[in-house]
Regions:
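A solvent-exposed interaction/effector surface
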Residues: 1-168
Length: 168
């Protein structure tokens, strides 16, 4: 099932997956929840919209939905962020970004993350987009809205894949 929704401009504060040398972190999630301690950084942002532990994974400058089960998808302009009401306090090591308003097709991925992402991607690319009146909007930003059920390797995993769209 898909939900179509017009979303307003999106203001976020987040962390970009590049180290000091400009290379992506090879152990992304270990670094984020270990050394970086992203939970503490995000919890210090008083203007955030999401609950603690609920994040946005934004994939910038894409022309289609990335293959999320492949590491390369996370290596290129990936931003782990929280939506904020205002861009006031930005913790050290984080950046602020604003993305334009867009219409989105929102799909829910359920199950163990690897297969949930793959199954949802297959549905989007092989069934929904070809048979809908929409196409991917490269002027928007594809993002994952992680929920409180978004633990790694957890069969109860749930996340929303938000695909920017325009009429064909």
């Amino acid at each position: 099932m898909v939900e179509l929704r017009d979303l307003p401009e999106l203001h976020v504060i987040g962390w970009t997956n590049v180290n000091a040398s400009g290379e992506p972190y090879p152990n992304l999630w270990e670094f984020v929840f270990g050394e970086l301690d992203i939970d503490a950084k995000f919890d210090s942002i008083t203007s955030k919209v999401q609950d603690s532990g609920c994040y946005l994974g934004l994939f910038q400058n894409r022309t289609s939905v990335p293959r999320l089960w492949e590491q390369a998808a996370w290596d290129h302009e990936f931003l782990l962020a929280v939506e904020v009401k205002q861009l006031d306090f930005i913790p050290e090591g984080l950046v602020q970004k604003t993305f334009p308003a867009s219409t989105y097709a929102i799909f829910t991925a359920n199950g163990v993350p690897h297969s949930a992402f793959q199954n949802t991607w297959n549905h989007i690319h092989n069934e929904w987009l070809p048979h809908s009146e929409y196409k991917f909007n490269p002027d928007g930003v594809f993002f994952i809205q992680y929920t409180e059920k978004s633990g790694p390797n957890d069969e109860r995993f749930e996340a929303h894949l938000c695909v920017p769209i325009v009429k064909k």
